[in-house]
């Protein structure tokens, strides 16, 4: 039996979708057993083009991979499992995109996945059929762009102003201070907590910890120094760094350096390669 192989391709959205979609991607797996960690992440919209499996969330909940699956923001790593070859096309969603898709219902799907047919019915299956027929990633992106333009049902009421301030706060400091965010937004601590829980899946302090850990994980996986970016001062000591990175990626710094999760490494490589075409929150985490 040959060695199992994972390939992940990424592409940035065009200007029409840049405020809603973080990146497009396709994952292809050749093998008969897939069990890979996915770190805590933003919401996802995924088309299962080949194969099927399960998502195992950190709290023990298990969800099947539907033909088209919507996954809410995750606050901790989950494990994707399958016993067959896979091909998955999808896109990540900025927090404004998640709000534009789900409206006030988004908070119910933090660390959860559900069948996109619940919202979009047979239409989304026709999109899936087009993606399967297209085969080439570039052609699938064109189809995906057209589909994505039609899924954001609540775009008019999406909190673009608020999420842009939160994203800038997260990207602008290696250890973001919640008081700074309160000052920028003009919101009370209670209002901030309610808004970030609704749109990001967690309160602001934990959100800052999540992206601090993911940025550190990206550097560690590539053998870079945390001290060169200021992240070295963002953790109390080595044990604090290990705990935080493992909480949000499922892996220790040593495991990241060793490339023990092939999917995690492929994801980090793909996002980093997008560079300036996407937000630093994407390319640096």
Regions picked out by a protein language model, each given a short descriptive name:
Residues 179, 193-198, 202-208:
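Long, low-complexity intrinsically disordered regions
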Residues 164-165, 208, 212-215:
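Pre-recognition alpha-helix immediately N-terminal to the DNA-recognition helix
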Residues 1-165, 169-179, 184-189, 202-203, ...:
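Alpha-helical bundle regulatory/interaction domains
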Residues 196-202, 244-255:
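A secondary-structure capping/hinge motif
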Residues 195, 210, 243, 259:
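Residue-level "edge-of-site" marker
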Residues 194, 214-218:
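Contiguous, well-ordered alpha-helical segments that form the cores/surfaces of helical PPI scaffolds
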């Amino acid at each position: 039996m040959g060695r199992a192989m994972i390939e992940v391709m990424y592409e940035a959205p065009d200007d029409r979708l840049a405020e809603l979609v973080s990146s497009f991607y396709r994952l292809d797996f050749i093998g008969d057993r897939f069990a890979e960690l996915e770190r805590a992440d933003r919401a996802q919209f995924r088309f299962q083009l080949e194969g099927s499996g399960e998502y195992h969330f950190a709290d023990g909940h298990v969800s099947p991979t539907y033909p088209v699956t919507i996954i809410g923001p995750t606050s901790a790593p989950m494990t994707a499992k399958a016993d067959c070859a896979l091909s998955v096309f999808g896109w990540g969603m900025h927090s404004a995109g998640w709000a534009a898709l789900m409206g006030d219902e988004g908070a119910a799907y933090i660390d959860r996945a559900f069948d996109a047919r619940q919202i979009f019915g047979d239409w989304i299956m026709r999109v899936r059929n087009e993606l399967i027929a297209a085969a080439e990633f570039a052609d699938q992106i064109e189809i995906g762009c057209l589909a994505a333009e039609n899924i954001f049902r609540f775009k008019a009421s999406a909190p673009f102003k608020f999420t842009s301030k939160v994203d800038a706060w997260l990207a602008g400091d290696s250890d973001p201070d919640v008081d700074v965010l309160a000052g920028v937004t003009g919101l009370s601590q209670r209002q901030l907590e309610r808004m970030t829980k609704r749109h990001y899946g967690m309160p602001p302090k934990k959100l800052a910890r999540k992206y601090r850990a993911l940025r550190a994980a990206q550097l560690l996986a590539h053998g870079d120094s945390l001290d060169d970016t200021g992240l070295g001062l963002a953790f109390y000591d080595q044990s604090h760094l290990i705990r935080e990175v493992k909480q949000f990626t499922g892996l220790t710094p040593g495991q990241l350096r060793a490339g023990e999760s092939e999917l995690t490494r492929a994801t980090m490589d793909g996002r980093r390669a997008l560079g300036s075409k996407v937000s630093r929150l994407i390319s640096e985490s």
